[in-house]
UniProtKB/Swiss-Prot annotation:
Residues 1-21 form the signal peptide. CDD domains: cupin_OxOx. InterPro entries: Cupin_1, Germin, Germin_Mn-BS, RmlC-like_jellyroll, RmlC_Cupin_sf. The lineage of its organism: Eukaryota, Viridiplantae, Streptophyta, Embryophyta, Tracheophyta. This is Germin-like protein subfamily 2 member 1.
Length: 219
């Protein structure tokens, strides 16, 4: 029989694992509706006065209609996270709707704070993610299919059909964050030096400047 000390050590190790694997900190009360206008800076958002909480803090119609896809990539992500549903604060979940024009692409990106699971509403998609061993895991999806993207790994979705497509994406974080590789590397403020990118991608500074012109920082 294991000693009490060993049993306690194993228990603490198990508990520590589950705590550390949680995408967001656990909630400590029934609800903590985000007080978004507050100037207080914490890891997350402070709670608004419980007496002022209403059902509107937990409600959104933002995913009901398709998003406009008339942009460079032919895709649009509409978020339903703590920024649009403040009642999600501390709950550790959020959703997005992604709409794709025919041939539209949600370009390679990562979610540093969450795992993502997509459910295909309409259309067909080619999706995939890359492991840290540079292995591509890819799949073709159709209406009703589900696919998971592990937390922090680079992934993408492309509409491979000639009709619009859409998915609902679920995340185990109230605010998963998104880093699009192209915009991050070539459209940052201040910019990453041309010589750094040229050496990293084994190309010329002139080519880097040309690519940067496609990713002008937002003003």
């Amino acid at each position: 029989m294991a000693s009490p000390t060993l049993t306690l050590l194993l228990l603490l190790t198990t508990v520590s694992f589950f705590i550390s694997s949680s995408a967001d900190p656990d909630m400590l009360q029934d609800l903590c509706v985000a007080d978004l206008p507050s100037g207080i800076k914490i890891n997350g958002f402070p709670c608004k006065d419980a007496a002022t909480v209403t059902s509107a803090d937990f409600f959104s119609q933002g995913l009901a209609k398709p998003g406009l896809t008339n942009n460079t990539f032919g895709a649009l992500v509409t978020g339903a996270n703590v920024m649009t549903i403040p009642g999600l604060n501390t709950l550790g979940v959020s959703l997005s709707r992604i709409d794709y024009a025919p041939g539209g692409l949600n370009p390679p990106h990562t979610h540093p704070r969450a795992t993502e699971v997509v459910f295909v509403l309409e259309g067909t998609l080619d999706v995939g993610f890359l492991t840290t061993a540079n292995k591509l895991i890819s799949q073709s999806l159709k209406k009703g299919d589900v696919f998971a993207f592990p937390k922090g790994l680079v992934h993408f979705q492309k509409n491979n059909g000639d009709v619009p497509a859409s998915v609902i994406a679920a995340f185990n974080s109230q605010l998963p964050g998104t880093q699009s590789l192209g915009a991050t590397l070539f459209g940052s403020t201040p910019p990453v030096p041309d010589n750094i990118l040229a050496q990293a991608f084994q190309t010329s500074p002139g080519t880097v400047k040309h690519i940067k012109s496609k990713f002008q920082p937002k003003k």
